[in-house]
């Protein structure tokens, strides 16, 4: 390619175009080439007198000066819009000429396409406050738009021209029914008009979603709309409130037997533990809004109510002097029954709060059955040696009459003053003081107590980490190094100090 020399030392092409000697860029004239070379040299000859900003072109400086004077010379003749740049005004005028017939009546935003309006209404807070669907049908999606929309169209349509019609295929079912006969409308499905606006727009939005919108968004929003009727505050709900939120089938199995316990009147239990387990599992699977530990709420109350059923209905005397048992007939022990229920339910029957009835003896609580994941879990105050001594020396006190059937001997239960207690006997988890923890706003906070150490946790994760420190066979055995503490104080000191025994690798 032959290049000629232009005046001023510029290299000119045969087509009378100039080229940059640094990067080879082709320019149509000397002024364009001069401005381009300033990008290589860094020269900015035009500088603002007020803020010191410099520019390569004078037009950029003049546009910048308007920022200081707040001057907006370009104004729209159809509305009050004003701007500093001509290209911005031209883009604004296109919104009037092209038109946005789909307008949201809750925030006055307009869109050119119906799908854009539906996508906006998924985020519009005013739309989700819930107005009647008839109001939306008559206003938001009327044939020619709302009155405000028609007034907007009158500025831009030509004389004698009809306003643009909305696509009939995009109308909602409610809009189609507006022209039906009233007698036919009464024969339609009663719940048709009561369909939520969110469901309608979500279905339509799924069919006309943009390719850039993830498909996963729809499933999450649908799930939130379907669970809108479930109101549950897990942080502030007490035991009684959580039990009242259990649906009817499970409430019938839990609250009816419990009522007989508080009224001290015998009531036969007609539902087995297997039915209670089945209903509880069905509740956990069908009600995702309920807490994940609903089984720990229902099962202790059910086991306690069956426990008291044998206390009232069986020939066993509940007097404080002792147990009178008919010879030749075996009666199941309440403690053993409660333990079997806890095993059947797949979760130990632990007490949630203080659910012991007022007329129940102090030594007998909702957690008198073997609980926790530790089979030998006993009182937190007793030492390991004392517990082993009780297990070896309580054989005479736990001997049963000859009339009893050959049930396996339970060394962890013993008879003491007419009551069946745990071996450690002295104190139970129900004898621990009950604390009500409140936040700064006065609302009750949910706590997670450790019945071994007497600690309260506000976070379930910290509670789980702490319970993992207790051993499986002995709660005061360190689950990290196997060190066996004498009491809870030594165990807490061992965990806090981190003085773990070296493990053989």
From Swiss-Prot:
Subcellular location: Nucleus
GO MF annotations, alphabetized: DNA-binding transcription factor activity; RNA polymerase II cis-regulatory region sequence-specific DNA binding; zinc ion binding
Pfam families assigned to the protein according to its UniProt record, in alphabetical order: zf-C2H2
Source organism per UniProt: Myxine glutinosa
Principal subcellular localization: nucleus
Source domain of life: Eukaryota
Keyword annotations of the record: DNA-binding, Metal-binding, Nucleus, Repeat, Transcription, Transcription regulation, Zinc, Zinc-finger
SMART domains (UniProt xref): ZnF_C2H2
Domain notes: N-terminal zinc-fingers recognize and bind to the consensus Ikaros target site (5'-GGGA-3'), found in the promoter regions of immunologically relevant genes. C-terminal zinc fingers mediate homodimerization and heterodimerization.
Protein name in the entry: Ikaros family zinc finger protein
Any Gene Ontology biological process: regulation of transcription by RNA polymerase II
ZnF (C2H2-type) intervals: 18-40, 46-68, 74-96, 102-128, 448-470, 476-500
Biased composition (Polar residues): 262-273, 309-327, 366-377, 424-439
SUPFAM superfamilies: beta-beta-alpha zinc fingers
Family under the similarity heading: Belongs to the Ikaros C2H2-type zinc-finger protein family.
Reported tissue expression: Expression is strongest in the blood, gills and intestine.
Subunit description: Heterodimer and homodimer with other IKAROS family members.
């Amino acid at each position: 390619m032959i290049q000629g020399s232009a005046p001023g030392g510029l290299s000119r092409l045969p087509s009378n175009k100039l080229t940059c000697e640094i990067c080879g860029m082709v320019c149509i004239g000397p002024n364009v080439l001069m401005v381009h070379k300033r990008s290589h040299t860094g020269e900015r000859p035009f500088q603002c007198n007020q803020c010191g900003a410099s520019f390569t072109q004078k037009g950029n400086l003049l546009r910048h000066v308007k920022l200081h004077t707040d001057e907006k010379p370009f104004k729209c003749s159809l509305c009050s819009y004003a701007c500093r740049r001509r290209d911005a005004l031209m883009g604004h005028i296109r919104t009037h000429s092209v038109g946005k017939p789909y307008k949201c009546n809750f925030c006055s935003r307009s869109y050119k396409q119906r799908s854009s309006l539906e996508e906006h209404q998924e985020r519009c807070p005013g739309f989700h406050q819930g107005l009647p669907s008839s109001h939306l049908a008559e206003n938001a999606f009327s044939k020619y738009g709302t009155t405000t929309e028609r007034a907007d169209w009158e500025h831009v349509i030509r004389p004698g021209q009809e306003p643009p019609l909305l696509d009939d295929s995009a109308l909602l079912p409610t809009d189609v029914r507006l022209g039906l006969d009233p007698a036919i409308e009464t024969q339609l499905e009663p719940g048709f008009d009561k369909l939520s606006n969110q469901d309608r727009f979500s279905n339509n939005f799924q069919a006309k979603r943009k390719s850039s919108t993830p498909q996963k968004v729809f499933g999450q929003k649908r799930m939130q709309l379907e669970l809108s009727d479930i109101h549950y505050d897990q942080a502030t709900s007490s035991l009684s409130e959580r039990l009242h939120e259990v649906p009817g089938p499970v409430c019938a199995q839990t609250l009816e037997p419990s009522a007989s316990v508080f009224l001290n009147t015998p009531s036969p239990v007609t539902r087995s533990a297997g039915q209670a387990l089945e209903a509880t599992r069905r509740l956990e699977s069908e009600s995702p809004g309920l807490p994940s530990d609903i089984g720990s709420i229902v099962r202790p109350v059910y086991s306690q109510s069956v426990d008291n059923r044998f206390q009232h209905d069986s020939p066993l005397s509940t007097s404080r002097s002792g147990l009178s048992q008919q010879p030749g007939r075996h009666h199941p022990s309440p403690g053993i029954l409660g333990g079997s229920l806890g095993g059947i339910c797949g979760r130990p029957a632990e007490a949630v709060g203080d659910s012991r009835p007022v007329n129940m003896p102090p030594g007998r609580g909702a957690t008198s059955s073997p609980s926790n994941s530790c089979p030998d879990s006993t009182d937190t105050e007793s030492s390991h040696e004392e517990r082993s001594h009780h297990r070896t020396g309580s054989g005479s006190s736990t001997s049963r009459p000859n009339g009893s059937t050959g049930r396996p001997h339970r060394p962890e239960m013993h008879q003491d003053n007419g009551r069946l207690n745990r071996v450690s006997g002295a104190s139970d988890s129900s004898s621990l003081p009950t604390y009500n923890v409140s936040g700064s706003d006065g609302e009750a906070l949910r706590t997670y107590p450790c019945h071994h150490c007497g600690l309260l946790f506000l976070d379930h994760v910290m509670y789980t980490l702490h319970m993992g420190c207790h051993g499986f066979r002995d709660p005061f055995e360190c689950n990290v190094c196997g060190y066996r503490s004498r009491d809870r104080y030594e165990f807490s000191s061992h965990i806090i100090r981190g003085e773990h025994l070296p493990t053989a690798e």
